[in-house]
């Protein structure tokens, strides 16, 4: 079934890295890591969705989370990176995926807002280490 293939790839891609504890991202000898263009497109789409997000009601957080999950699926199913840059990206990506999943399951506006602010900050971190 072609339709479920990206979901399966996404799940297996995440599972392969889930056992690693959250680690501190390191620069590439003082420089930012280069992210492949096709992957960066999905990251920038998510960053834009977070930057332009306006909450009018609690359900908007869940809508944002679903939108972000779609881009995470596209990002992970199109993963072409290898080596140290790939490993460093995962140090950012796995906690980010966890945040999005928590936002999707948030139970109230206070929790949703706190998670949203953490998501905003995650892109500041991303831009410190990746280009």
Outline where the language-model segments fall.
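Short hydrophobic alpha-helical module
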Residues: 49-56, 71, 75-78
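Immediate post-signal-peptide N-terminus of mature secreted/exported proteins
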Residues: 2-55
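Short flexible/disordered coil segments
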Residues: 13, 17, 76, 81, ...
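Non-transmembrane, amphipathic alpha-helical segments
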Residues: 27-38, 53-60, 81, 88, ...
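Charged, amphipathic alpha-helical oligomerization/scaffolding segments
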Residues: 38-41, 45, 63, 67-70, ...
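Short, solvent-exposed, charged loop/turn and helix-capping segments
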Residues: 72-90
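Helix-rich interaction surfaces within compact, conserved domain-sized segments
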Residues: 86-131
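The feature marks either
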Residues: 9-17, 70-73, 98-99
């Amino acid at each position: 079934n072609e339709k479920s293939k990206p979901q399966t790839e996404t799940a297996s891609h995440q599972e392969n890295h889930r056992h690693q504890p959250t680690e501190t991202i390191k620069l590439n000898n003082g420089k930012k890591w280069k992210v492949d263009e096709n992957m960066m497109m999905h990251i920038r789409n998510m960053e834009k969705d977070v930057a332009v997000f306006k909450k009018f009601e609690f359900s908007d957080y869940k809508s944002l989370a679903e939108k972000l999950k779609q881009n995470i699926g596209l990002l992970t199913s199109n993963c072409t990176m290898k080596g140290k840059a790939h490993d460093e990206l995962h140090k950012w990506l796995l906690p980010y995926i966890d945040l999005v999943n928590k936002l999707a399951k948030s139970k109230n506006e206070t929790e949703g807002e706190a998670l949203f602010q953490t998501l905003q900050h995650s892109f500041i971190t991303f831009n410190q280490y990746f280009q």
